Each structure stands twice: as structure tokens, then as C-alpha cells.
Amino acid sequence: MENNLNLCNQTNYRFRYKKDFQNILDEIALFFKEKLPLELDLNIVDNILIKKISKQYYKKDKETDVLSFPSELANMKNALGFFHIGEIFLNYEKVILQAKEYNHSLKREFCYLFTHGIIHLYGYDHVKENEAKEMNAIVESIMQKLNIKRRK
């Protein structure tokens, strides 16, 4: 079973973590015991585009780090022979800033937010404290399995 990550870099930023992201997607499939291959669309964007998307779909006029949109095709996964879980928009400018703020490596921050975005596609959220703990525990377990550490 091969999971498919469709990457669209809509910036001039030289993105270096596709292999790491593919490993994360593979680990997610194992974690959720998926029987069909996963397919995910990933867009690397900047502050301007993510702010526009956030305003249009969430009515929030601000930049954010990651936005996740579940797939309309999820109900058709058996007919398609794969599970298209959705689309993620990852703001590289915010990722770089947050890596510095949290004293994380750039790889860690990119991987953490990518994983966080996927977990949202599975219906998890962090509005309530108990939900946030559960969501973060899943993300951290994926980071540990792939030996992606917090520090530089």
C-alpha cells in the first residue's frame, strides 16, 4: 500500500521535507489502521495567501501556520480504491518564525505542523483542553516514532 502526497509549492521557498512528510503520512496510515492508501494534497504558501484563505473560509483576517480542509471524496474511498483525506495549506513564513520562537529546528516545526494538520483531517480539534491534549499526544507519538526532535 503506497500513500500519495501531492505537493504544490506556491512560493519561491526551497522546501526540503517532502521525504519526511511522506514518512509522516505513512505513519499516520499505520496509526489509524487504514486499509486503503491515503492521498493528501499539500500546498506550501506564504502569509498573503493563507490570510486570504483564512478570511474566505474561516472569517479570520490574519495569518496562521496551517489550514486543513477535509476531502469531499472521503465518502467515496471504497469506490476510488484510496482515501483522499483532504488538503493542507502550510505557511512557510509562519513556520520559520515559530521555529525561532519555540527554539525548534525548522524540520521539527514543519513536520509538527504538517502532522497537526493531518490530525485535524481526522476530525480532531483543540478547542477544549482535553481535546488539545489528545491531539497533541497523537502528534507527539508520530514525532517520536520518526525521531523528529524539538531542539536544533
From Swiss-Prot:
Quote a single Gene Ontology cellular component term: cytoplasm
Q: Name one GO molecular function term.
A: zinc ion binding
Q: Write down how the cofactor binds this protein.
A: Binds 1 zinc ion.
Enzyme kind, highest EC tier = hydrolase
| Predominant location | cytoplasm
Which Pfam family, giving just one, matches this sequence?
YbeY
Q: InterPro entries from the xrefs?
A: MetalPrtase_cat_dom_sf_prd (IPR023091), YbeY (IPR002036)
Q: Does this UniProt record's set of keywords contain Transcription? A: no
Q: Which domain of life does this protein belong to?
A: Bacteria
List the EC numbers from the record.
3.1.-.-
Q: Give its localization.
A: Cytoplasm
List the disulfide bonds in this chain.
Answer: none
Chain's role: Single strand-specific metallo-endoribonuclease involved in late-stage 70S ribosome quality control and in maturation of the 3' terminus of the 16S rRNA.
Q: Kindly give the NCBIfam families that the UniProt entry links to this protein.
A: rRNA maturation RNase YbeY
Instruction: Report the family membership.
Output: Belongs to the endoribonuclease YbeY family.
According to UniProt, the name of this protein is Endoribonuclease YbeY
* Organism for this UniProt entry: Mycoplasma mobile (strain ATCC 43663 / 163K / NCTC 11711) (Mesomycoplasma mobile)
